Structures are given as C-alpha cells and as structure tokens.
From Swiss-Prot:
Domain of life of the native organism: Eukaryota
The organism of origin for this protein: Homo sapiens
Disulfide bond sites: C97-C188
InterPro entries: GPCR_Rhodpsn, GPCR_Rhodpsn_7TM, Olfact_rcpt
Main location: membrane
UniProt lineage: Eukaryota, Metazoa, Chordata, Craniata, Vertebrata
Keyword Iron applies: no
UniProt keyword list: Cell membrane, Disulfide bond, G-protein coupled receptor, Glycoprotein, Membrane, Olfaction, Receptor, Sensory transduction, Transducer, Transmembrane, Transmembrane helix
Gene designation: OR13H1
Cytoplasmic membrane side: 47-54, 121-139, 217-236, 292-308
Keyword Transmembrane helix applies: yes
Protein name: Olfactory receptor 13H1
C-alpha cells in the first residue's frame, strides 16, 4: 500500500458465521473436515509424485503444482475461519487483512491459469499422442507453470498497489476472510478504477481461461467419440465429466463473484459462494484429478509395500 493512504480504521470485524449462530457447530465441523481433507489429500499427492519416479511426467508435474496451490490456498483462509467460529473478538488488523487478500488473490489467479495449462496438456496428449513427449517437454512444462505464477504475482501486485482506500468508520466485513471485494465495499473512496481493474483482470484470469478449458474439453470429447470400445468411451467420458464438473464449480463460482457490479452484490450470498472456490475445490482436486488414476494407485501400493 502507498504510504499516503490515511484511514480511520485499523482493524476489521469479520462476521463469518456469527450471524447464523444455529449453524456454527455444523459450519465448524464441515470446514474442519474440508481443511483436513485438503491438507491430507494435497500433501499426500505432493509426497507421492516426488517419491515415485514413474509419476515424473508432465501431467503429474502440473498436478503437483496444483496440489501445492490448493494446500496453500486452503491454509490462507480456512484456519482463520475455524478460529473465528467461536471467537468473541474475531478482529483482523488492516495489514493482516491486506496480506490475506494479496496471498489469496495470487494463489487463486495462479490456479485459474494453471488449470488452463493442464487442459492444454490433455489436448496435446489425446490429439497428438505420438508427439506428446516432444511438445510437452520439461522446459515447456516449467515455462507454463512459471508463467502462471509470474502472471498471478504481477496482476495481484497491480491490483493491491492500485488501492487508495480511505475507511470512514465502517469496519464490519460480512465474510469468512478478507478479500479485495470486501475491502472495496467498506471504503468511502471512489472505487470505480479498482472495480474496472478487477473486471479486466477477471476477464483475463477467469473468463478467457475458462473458455479455453471448455474448448479443450470439446476437442477431447470429439477424440473420445472416435474410440471404438464402448467401455473405453464411457470411462473416458466419466473421467472428463468429473474433471469438467470441478473446473466449472471453481471458475463458475469465482466468475459469479468477481464479474458483476457491486450494486448486484449480496454479502450473505457471496460469502457462501466463496466456499466453493476457496474450500470445496481445493479438497476435491486431488480426489478427482489424481487419486483415482491407476498410476497413483500403483504408487500408493508401492509406498505401502515399502512400509511393510
């Protein structure tokens, strides 16, 4: 933040689930289960991919990065949401709130771009299998991942550094965590530039990658149709369908949050929508993308045999 940002507010009150006290225990239990599943599932995938040389392939390189992103993304907000469930003073200082906003934004943006890179990898693998190892070589994979991370950091820095927020007393955030939209809603400054930048950034990090992913899966579906075996087609469609479902939940919920005017924003609705891309998909990704694969099951058996 610029040094000339003068505010009358130094901490924020995060409402979280406190305006629904009857749901507090249920919410705490669900978030705890989701967070532990996120840690175990993604942490185990990172370990397994590093441990087994047979998983040192392009797709698992992408999946290990996705698992790392999901692990960090879940950790950026869920532990705080758990602590604040039963806290009598669920306050967060302005620097911590801004830091959480920056970290969550960078991780989410990187994941949006990484999912598009993974879709490209699958298209190459299915449409051009003979040249797959040539097209998706090590440097190309590293470049795609580095571009995802680099672009997310640059865009996040642009959005955060462009904030010139003056808070005139209101400090109640109706959310489970600090997000850039939550801060903008509280300010008494003119936020038209910030809203415009968020919209443009969302087009390049949400709408375009999601469109690319959908087109990629259409190409994959056309390739699957040419499979002669009915059982093979059904299995491929089931796999692609589950992948596409999770991707749609992630992109769709984020698009519904960030690509609308603030006048059409409903805080109670928005904070529960954020659970889909901030908590649910980080838990589901290792289950959908990795743990059902034969290579992963084989690697798990290998680990279990070594332990015995």
């Amino acid at each position: 933040m610029a040094m000339d940002n003068v505010t009358a507010v130094f901490q924020f009150l995060l409402i979280g689930i406190s305006n629904y006290p009857q749901w507090r225990d249920t919410f705490f239990t669900l978030v705890l289960i989701i967070y532990l599943s996120t840690l175990l599932g993604n942490g185990f995938m990172i370990f397994l991919i590093h441990f087994d040389p047979n998983l040192h392939t392009p797709i698992y390189f992408f999946l290990s990065n996705l698992s790392f992103l999901d692990l960090c993304y879940g950790t950026a907000s869920m532990p705080q949401a758990l602590v604040h469930c039963f806290s009598t003073h669920p306050y967060l200082s302005y620097p911590r709130c801004l830091a959480q906003t920056s970290v969550s934004l960078a991780l989410a943006t990187a994941e949006c771009l990484l999912l598009a890179a993974m879709a490209y990898d699958r298209v190459v693998a299915i449409s051009n299998p003979l040249r797959y190892s040539v097209v998706m070589n090590g440097p190309v994979c590293v470049c795609l991942v580095a571009t995802s991370w680099g672009t997310s950091l640059v865009l996040t820095a642009m959005l955060i550094l462009s904030l010139r927020l003056h808070f005139c007393g209101a400090n109640v955030i109706n959310h489970f965590a600090c997000e850039i939209l939550s801060l903008i809603k509280l300010t008494c400054s003119d936020t038209s530039l910030n809203e415009f930048m968020i919209l443009i950034t969302s087009i390049f990090t949400l709408l375009l990658p999601f469109g690319f992913v959908l087109l990629s899966y259409i190409r994959i579906a056309m390739a699957i149709i040419r499979i002669r075996s009915l059982q093979g087609r059904l299995k491929a469609f089931t796999t692609c369908g589950s992948h596409l479902t999770v991707v749609t939940i992630f992109y769709g919920s984020a698009i519904s949050m960030y690509m609308k005017t603030q006048s059409k924003s409903y805080p109670d609705q928005d904070k529960f929508i954020s659970v889909f891309y901030g908590a649910l998909t980080p838990m589901l990704n290792p289950l959908i993308y990795s743990l059902r694969k034969k290579d992963v099951k084989r690697a798990i058996r290998k680990v279990m045999l070594k332990r015995t």
